[in-house]
Structures are given as structure tokens and as C-alpha cells.
A protein has these predicted regions:
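The feature marks the first
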Residues: 41-53, 57-97
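N-terminal export/targeting leaders of redox proteins
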Residues: 1-43, 93, 213, 223-226
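The canonical Cys-X-X-Cys-His
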Residues: 59-68, 120, 156-165, 218
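Sequence context surrounding c-type heme c attachment/ligation sites in exported
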Residues: 47-63, 85, 89, 148-160, ...
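Extracytoplasmic/secreted proteins, especially bacterial periplasmic and envelope-associated proteins
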Residues: 45-49, 87-90, 104-107, 119, ...
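Axial heme c-ligation environment in periplasmic c-type cytochrome domains
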Residues: 26, 64, 73-81, 95-135, ...
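Electrostatic cytochrome c docking/interface patches
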Residues: 26-58, 126-152
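Protein kinase-like catalytic domain
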Residues: 50-51, 66, 96, 147, ...
């Protein structure tokens, strides 16, 4: 038997339909308005900040330590040219955290805005790295064996499995090592082993299994990779 809806029920039904339609319309519009605009890194601004710093903030020019176009000539300071943009930005961010606290870089990184970090990373990523050279002929074979094959008895994997056969690395996750200063690479392995650098559990584990001589040998070999 058909029964007519009361005026109240009809009004309520219409109101619910209207609310449902409005909610649906808002849901459809959300993605367009909810998505925050992605700000693209400005390599030009990064180049200026890298070369000149910002005297007003007491921020020195990166070039004074890391060299023209990111090709450091100081063995203790890393070459940054050609490193992956995302990786570089990640390291600048991590310098502001306890996991990679470093006396010099932590202070500078904290002075940079998020945009400035990205700009510098974008600039360095497109620079051409200059080659290095292995210097110790007596240990180059040991370094080569460790880099290419690891040390099975110590459960040390081949460095090449993550950093590539020629040390070019893998974008974002594993940095370029080819041509890097031996002194810097040894310093980082030592920091991983001793706990001063804690932003990679994988590298900390590997470094703890390497002796000083093994670190020096593989770091010297890596310096000569092209």
C-alpha cells in the first residue's frame, strides 16, 4: 500500500539531498585547492649563495671551503659537484639534527632556510665533478677487493653494490664516491664507526667491521674512480 510522505519528511529528505550534494561538490574541488604549490628549486639563487654567502647573517660563502663549482681542493672538505640534488638537500637538513651534528656545518645549515638548502643542492647537482686519483700503490689492490667484493669473513658487502662499479652512486639514496678525497671518506667512515655520524644505520654497521687500514685502502681506491 502506498503512503504519501508527510510535508516534514519531504522537507527533511530534500534538505539531506542538498547537504549531500554540497559535500560532494566540496570533495571534488578539494584536490585543486588542497594541493600546496610545489616551489621549484632555483639553481641561480643557489649559485649566488654558494659563491657569496650572506654577510648580513654571518653566513660565509660555501666556495671558501668546498671550492669553485663544488670541486673542493682541500682534502678534509668534500667535493660536492655532481652529487644528487635530493641527497644533497637531505644532508643539509640532517646537519640540523643530532644524527649528523658537525661543529662547522651544523651551524651553517641551521642558518639556511628550506628554500636556500634546495637552491644550493640544485646548483651543485648540475656541476661537473673533477676526477681524483688513488695515491697509495701499495694498498690499491686491497681497496679494489673491498670495494668490488666486500670482505666475506667480516660480513662486509661490496661497496659497489650500492655506490656503483665506478662510484657514481644511486640517485637519492647512495652518494657518488668516485673522485672523492681520501681524507674525507676516511673521516666519514670513522664517524660512522664511532657514532659521531648516525644518519645511516647501514653505514654504521659496515664501518664498525672495517679496520683503519681497510678504511684507508678503500677510500684511496675510491678517490681514483671515474
Amino acid at each position: 500500500m502506498n503512503r504519501a510522505f508527510s510535508p516534514f519528511v519531504k522537507s527533511l529528505f530534500v534538505a539531506l539531498l542538498a547537504v549531500s550534494a554540497a559535500a560532494s561538490a566540496n570533495q571534488e574541488k578539494k584536490p585543486a585547492h588542497a594541493e600546496a604549490a610545489v616551489v621549484k628549486a632555483d639553481a641561480g639563487k643557489g649559485a649566488t649563495l654558494y659563491a657569496e654567502g650572506d654577510a648580513a647573517r654571518g653566513l660565509p660563502a660555501c666556495v671558501s671551503c668546498h671550492g669553485a663549482a663544488g670541486n673542493s681542493t682541500i682534502a678534509a672538505n668534500p667535493k660536492l659537484a655532481g652529487l644528487n640534488e635530493v641527497y644533497l638537500n637531505k644532508q643539509l637538513v640532517e646537519f640540523t639534527k643530532p644524527e649528523r651534528n658537525q661543529p662547522v656545518m651544523t651551524g651553517f645549515a641551521k642558518m639556511l632556510t628550506d628554500a636556500e638548502k634546495k637552491n644550493i643542492a640544485a646548483y651543485l647537482a648540475v656541476q661537473t665533478p673533477k676526477p681524483g686519483a688513488a695515491k697509495n700503490k701499495d694498498t690499491v689492490e686491497l681497496g679494489k677487493r673491498i670495494y668490488r667484493g666486500g670482505i666475506a669473513e667480516k660480513s662486509v658487502p661490496a661497496c659497489a653494490s650500492c655506490h656503483g662499479a665506478s662510484g657514481t652512486g644511486m640517485p637519492i639514496q647512495y652518494p657518488r664516491l668516485g673522485g672523492q678525497h681520501q681524507d674525507y671518506t676516511v673521516a666519514q667512515l670513522t664517524a660512522f664507526r664511532g657514532g659521531a655520524r648516525k644518519n645511516s644505520a647501514q653505514m654504521s654497521t659496515i664501518a664498525m667491521r672495517l679496520s683503519d687500514d681497510e678504511m684507508k685502502a678503500v677510500a684511496d681506491y675510491v678517490a681514483g674512480l671515474k
